[in-house]
Amino acid sequence: YRVPPGFSTTRLSLVDRGMIYAIAHVRGGDDMGRAWYLAGKTTERKNTFNDFIDVAKGLIARNYTAAGRISVEGRSAGGQVMGVIYNEAPELWGAVLAGVPFVDVINTMVDETLPLTPGEWPEWGNPITDKAAFDYMLSYSPYDHVTAKAYPPMLVSAGLNDPRVTYW
């Protein structure tokens, strides 16, 4: 999972208007090699979320932006990151875009009838056979951590025919 490098006229247009554009290369992505990827999977998954929040705090500390003025976007597993950071540090974000987000981690990963669930167990862990994996997933699952508090605006999109992230 990563944002491929490349030129984007959309990004250039944002920068020309005074916006700052940053990409967070968090653990769990393959941008920095296999060890970096492994440091963000299964029982190390929280590193991904912490890294993302740390990047935002670093941008704030260096006066590139301020808390509440950062817009973020992620899709699928990146949408899961959006869900976690939304719950963990809502004060940092001005807006959150989550495309087909994987936010109901527990119900998805315990339903082995879903076509992709068994194949994802090596990446996330198997909560059916491993209580520690279940507890770890539950500790960050965005769906299971929504509380009554102030949240920034969020746009969520779903795919009617997405086999990885169901729309319900």
For the regions a language model picked out, list residue spans one by one:
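Short, surface-exposed "cap/lid" segments of acyl-processing enzymes
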Residues: 1-9
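Active-site-proximal cap/loop segments of hydrolase catalytic domains
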Residues: 8-17, 23-168
